[in-house]
From Swiss-Prot:
This is Phosphoribosylformylglycinamidine cyclo-ligase. Belongs to the AIR synthase family. It catalyses: 2-formamido-N(1)-(5-O-phospho-beta-D-ribosyl)acetamidine + ATP = 5-amino-1-(5-phospho-beta-D-ribosyl)imidazole + ADP + phosphate + H(+). Disulfide bonds: none annotated. NCBIfam families: purM (TIGR00878). SUPFAM superfamilies: PurM C-terminal domain-like, PurM N-terminal domain-like. It comes from the Bacteria. It comes from Shewanella baltica (strain OS185). HAMAP family: AIRS. The gene is purM. Pathway: Purine metabolism; IMP biosynthesis via de novo pathway; 5-amino-1-(5-phospho-D-ribosyl)imidazole from N(2)-formyl-N(1)-(5-phospho-D-ribosyl)glycinamide: step 2/2.
Amino acid sequence: MSTPTPLSYKDAGVDIDAGNALVSNIKAAVKRTRRPEVMGNLGGFGALCEIPTKYKQPVLVSGTDGVGTKLRLAIDYKKHDTVGIDLVAMCVNDLIVQGAEPLFFLDYYATGKLDVETATSVVNGIGEGCFQSGCALIGGETAEMPGMYEGEDYDLAGFCVGVVEKADIIDGSKVAAGDALIALASSGPHSNGYSLVRKVLEVSQADPQQDLNGKPLIEHLLEPTKIYVKSLLKLIAASDVHAMAHITGGGFWENIPRVLPDNLKAVIQGDSWQWPAVFSWLMENGNIAEYEMYRTFNCGVGMLVALPADKVDAALSLLAAEGEQAWLIGAIADREGNEEQVEIL
């Protein structure tokens, strides 16, 4: 009887050496995001982080998210260097809504066969997103799982923890009739609505490389999600922010009511901004109703801020100085009976 051929983990489809090569490749990206509160180095069983000493009654705020089917487009068009920014943005933009400063971030990268070059590009993007938001990339998990993913497919998830002073939590309880609403421009569809985006591409049979306002359509669609953390932390410190809404899945209709008391509504001036070209293209080529657009996409508005009307001019000046495109988009009003909490005029 012949002796069976010895098997290794690599024979089963898991390449430990590839995983080690990835860790080596991303060390510089991780180091760039390090905060003084981080203890120890990459590779420990658990990652350690102190709470900044400036907080008297610190409250930890956590969030987790993914990139959705935007990943499908990124994989199909081999654009891997910005989906990591998307991943971080989706988490940290949720934290800043409650006034929280992001402290640290962890990622989960899963694939059937680890491609070190692709994974390095993705994680370097995560590092860039963390750098943009002042957040430490403190650890993560790379899962190589043969038989679970087809071909070059991979999936991403992110987890973030931030901190806010207990007395400074922004929860919408201070919102009042007469408050102004300021919009911060998005960079594109961000990371929401991509199943509909892909359906529009399929039904319209459009060429993703076609020109749209001077650059290929696919570049508009894969533009990374804008991170608002640093500019909004400065606004929070300088003004009296009553509420913020991150316009993600569910669009205007679902995200704005999350931060409003039941007796109030947001009145949006629909003519106060022009939709970026990519949204008009999607609406036209998908024959999408306006209501559905506002329910699915941010339509050019990535973040809304509610604050007293007499603070608007100073807030707009500060945001402009921070490089944000911001404008007065509406106001808070009393809600009568069963009125919708969001009204777009």
